Amino acid sequence: MTRFLFLFLFVITSAFSQQKIETKKVSSTLSKNGITIQDDYSWLENTSDKEVADWVTLQNNISEEKLAELVKNYNFSFKIKDYDYLSTNGLPSKKGKYFYNFYRIEKNKPSVLYYRENLNDLAKPLVDPFDVYKDANVVLSGYFPSKNSRYLAFKISPNGSDRQEIKFKDFANKKYLDDVLTDIKFSNVAWNDDKGVFYKKNSNKEFFAKDSTYQLYYHKIGDIQSKDQLVFDTSNTKSNFSFFTKQNKLFVVETSEDETTKNYYYSTIENESFQFKNFIKDDKSNLELLNIINDKFYFSDEKYSWGNISYFDINNRTENTILIPQVYSHLLVGATFLENYIICKYDNMGKYYMSIHDYTGKFIRKFEAPHNMDFQIRFYDEKTNELFVTFYSYTISSLNYKLNITTGANDIYFNDFIQPKPTLFPFNYFETKTITYKSRDNKDIPIVIIHKKGIELNGNNPTLLRVYGGFGSVSSPNYDTGLLHFLEKGGVYAFAKVRGGGEKGKNWHKEGKGLKKINSINDFVDAAEFLIREKYTNPNKLAINGGSHGGLVVGAAMTQRPDLFKVVISEMGRLDMASLDKYTSGIHHFDEYGNPNNKEEFESMLSYSPYHTIKEDVNYPTCLIITSENDDRVPPFHSYKFAAKLQNRKKQKNPIYLKVNKVAGHSGNISSYEKRVKQQSEFYSFIWE
């Protein structure tokens, strides 16, 4: 490949200016299913090439300079830090014998895991990722106490990668063990008593290689990894799987490569021989497993779209018994199984509540969340029959409550070490509502809208419209102090719950996946038109944002209707659908997007693929395209190619910025507090401009 000169241009718009790089084209084509596609920027996929690295550096120099200027102008970082200091922490979670939570001790280092034996005790540090890894660019991504809390297994993510390591700590002497497990990807940790752990290993040899196969291994505490026992192998089937241990059994749920069929297995683990019984064979009904208790398999049935709880005996499946029926139009978000109770969490158009039942299905009590807040159950005290719950919302960090199941009493909880703080703003300072708008095919699409109460909605409000809309994911309020300042300054926030997500049940997901993926994008475009029509904003004040699958949606919406948006921010977006099966985990997402080896599905994917729907004669909105160099879930060259193609057109006058996070992965720069604040400040400053 010949070296090239970067050509810099200076572009001026009403708000943004940019030094622009003209990226060379190298003629290249991709052929599938009798369809040939021109792909002149495929050379940017070679991330190890110095030429690509130099190109990324120049792109970053330009975007960093502009973002630094905007951050200085709008000073979001000061308010973010101020609001963070005044925010209340949630209750610790109880796992086994101890209570756990995270604290940031040093602003330039990762969070530290703390523990306490009793809720009224002073928390003590347990795992500091920096001490373990001697690197500030590392995150503690999960922790798993053994059955009797003798050991703690924890996952470390270096440099943001999905490829992680598992390490261990001894609770008795508080020392780290020598055991280290590597090549861990998309794995939990399941204990066999205090003896050892099960984990999933990925056999990829190259960083961005197409995911090959996964194997389940058993590691005995004290052994080196090379001695670990292979328990379950998908090398021949190329399937994926999840696993967990329950009451001396190891359960494995295997999903076929095309994601249409599941097999369920279990094995006893006492003698470590691991002989599996296939107790559900070739299931295509898409059961949603909730729990397995005393050999009863609790699940939500696909034919009840809003969610129910049924069960059967894994040793003798003669029929399914419905325990808790579906509540139509109230989404069953999840279920917590206690010794004597099943606690169902429901979402009724942004109003959350818990419904408590016994194991006969009998209704016991209902608790409604205050102020339309979401909640997490942190632990249950069997002695007092009390639930300890943290409530939270987009604008309130946390309210900690104890709820008595017997009496229905509920009170704010605090002690010497867990003190409530006044909310930053009165509960009625911001108005949060979930309403619906009509899609172009006359569907009712939920949308969350937040703004200061009493603000004049005159069609001229700076507005941020966000989306995810994929994989049946159910969105939840995310407390964000950058968003708080944006709202306090007069901004409007909206989140569109488009088809493809799971906010209106299982059918809602089906209506936005595969050949119907275009519905997700159309619903999002219709949300923008709704906000403009109802005088929340106008195209010169509307910014859109989405990450991962949401990055695809906003990229596709921009190429479909560039006239609707002033600013577009795509984060870690899957923007080149033709390459879905070429790299990392894409081969496991055919059910969501389509199979590129099927002509009809491939044509559907190309019809909305942001990279392939860029037109030569359109001046697209100002863009900030964000990715991370170590994102091995959605590789960064999706964003590289999209940015290069947008920039390299004569008609493009609005600036296109590419920001590549260094030593970071799919979640961005989250390894330290200062990096997180910088990331938030840049984001909100960019859309405010």
Segments (PLM) and residue ranges:
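Beta-propeller folds
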Residues: 7-372, 376-386, 394-398, 403, ...
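Generic beta-strand/beta-sheet core signal
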Residues: 169, 200, 219, 254-255, ...
